[in-house]
Each structure stands twice: as structure tokens, then as C-alpha cells.
């Protein structure tokens, strides 16, 4: 069984036991649980339910894993004929979630 969830404005396809990488979660410490109630669709084994936009009474419980940073992205700004250039680096924080259960199915 799988579910399509929306979390922080992005959509993810999850199954029980799978892990996903989302933008940083600073509200919950690693090892804690979160419940995602924005479930767009569930399906599998002859069962398909589609919400409009979300399903009522269905949720996904996930365990918060490690927080880590992505590889560095280098942004280079340049203006011709003005002797202006600037290099900026950025590393985004991410959190790994492990889906423990799909609730309300």
C-alpha cells in the first residue's frame, strides 16, 4: 500500500518502511514522530482513494531521522565591463523521514 502526501508544499509517494528526504524539520528532534494529515491519495491491492484535495481520517506517521546538509551549490554573479564578480556558496539543510505507518486505512 502506498500514499501520496503533501508536506511543506511538496508531494511525496511513500510506503510503509520507506524513507524520504524533506526540507529541514526544526520543530521535532531526531527520533521523534510526526503525523502528516495532508494525504492526497492512497492506493494498492485493489484499493484506490483520491481526496479532493485531501482524504478525511487518513494520515501518515513518520519517524524523524538524521538532519544533514546537501552538497554545496556555487552561484556566480558577473557584470561585464564593470569588473564586478561575486561567488556565493549555499548548502541546504534536509531531514530524513522513515514512514512507520499509514493510519486510517
From Swiss-Prot:
Biological process annotations from GO: translation
Record flagged with keyword RNA-binding: yes
Record PROSITE patterns: RIBOSOMAL_L21
One Gene Ontology term, aspect cellular component: cytoplasm
Listed Pfam families: Ribosomal_L21p (PF00829)
Binding partners and assembly: Part of the 50S ribosomal subunit. Contacts protein L20.
Family of this protein: Belongs to the bacterial ribosomal protein bL21 family.
Protein name as it appears in the record: Large ribosomal subunit protein bL21
Organism listed in the record: Treponema pallidum (strain Nichols)
